[in-house]
């Protein structure tokens, strides 16, 4: 076991990664596994520049951090929740799911409350929008400022990525 672990430190944690590190050392073109490693690094926020150098120890260090983070996520959710997007949305929709011990005591009332909370979430969201609209209507003295900011928001609606360049023009006109 110890000799296998030492060889894994030199070549990476998997057989496929060992072949890609050897190819990277000899300068041959990269294969799918190295691209997958780069995309995993980008997804988990790891160092993108470390695996590109092609050193076995660096790739193992980056791979170890990814391998360490994947089982934690899969243990946290159900076995079918390996998709991070599904995991993210399930946490948003029902963030207050009770632990199984609490659910046994008063399961019906808790499930009713959780469904009620999910049903009322769009209502709360629309209520916030109504509050914002009523706040703009309440400031009748600064009616033109409110219109200016609303027109800026509607003009920005298309781009959204460059707020600095577009938002400067309505201010200059005023």
From Swiss-Prot:
Pfam families: Myelin_MBP (PF01669). Several charge isomers are produced as a result of optional post-translational modifications, such as phosphorylation of serine or threonine residues, deamidation of glutamine or asparagine residues, citrullination and methylation of arginine residues. Chicken MBP contains 4 charge components denoted as C1, C2, C3 and C8. C1 lacks any phosphorylation sites, whereas C2 and C3 contain respectively 10 and 8 phosphorylation sites and arginine residues modified to citrulline. All three charge components contain deamidated glutamines and asparagine, and a methylated arginine. The modification Deamidated glutamine is found at residues 4, 72, 102, 147. The keyword Acetylation applies. Belongs to the myelin basic protein family. Is, with PLP, the most abundant protein component of the myelin membrane in the CNS. Has a role in both the formation and stabilization of this compact multilayer arrangement of bilayers. Each splice variant and charge isomer may have a specialized function in the assembly of an optimized, biochemically functional myelin membrane. This is Myelin basic protein. It comes from Gallus gallus (Chicken). The gene is MBP.
């Amino acid at each position: 076991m110890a000799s296998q672990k030492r060889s894994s430190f030199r070549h990476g944690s998997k057989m496929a990664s060992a072949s890609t590190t050897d190819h990277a050392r000899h300068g041959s073109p990269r294969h799918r596994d190295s691209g997958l490693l780069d995309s995993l690094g980008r997804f988990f926020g790891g160092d993108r520049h470390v695996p590109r150098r092609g050193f076995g120890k660096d790739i193992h260090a980056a791979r170890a951090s990814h391998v360490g983070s994947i089982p934690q996520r899969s243990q946290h959710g159900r076995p079918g929740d390996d998709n991070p997007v599904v995991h993210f949305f399930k946490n948003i929709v029902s963030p207050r799911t009770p632990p199984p011990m609490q659910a046994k005591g008063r399961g019906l009332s808790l499930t009713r409350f959780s469904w009620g909370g999910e049903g009322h979430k769009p209502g709360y969201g629309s209520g916030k929008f109504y509050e914002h609209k009523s706040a703009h209507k309440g400031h009748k003295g600064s009616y033109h400022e409110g219109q200016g900011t609303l027109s800026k928001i509607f003009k920005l609606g298309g781009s959204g990525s460059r707020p600095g360049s577009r938002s400067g023009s309505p201010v200059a006109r005023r």
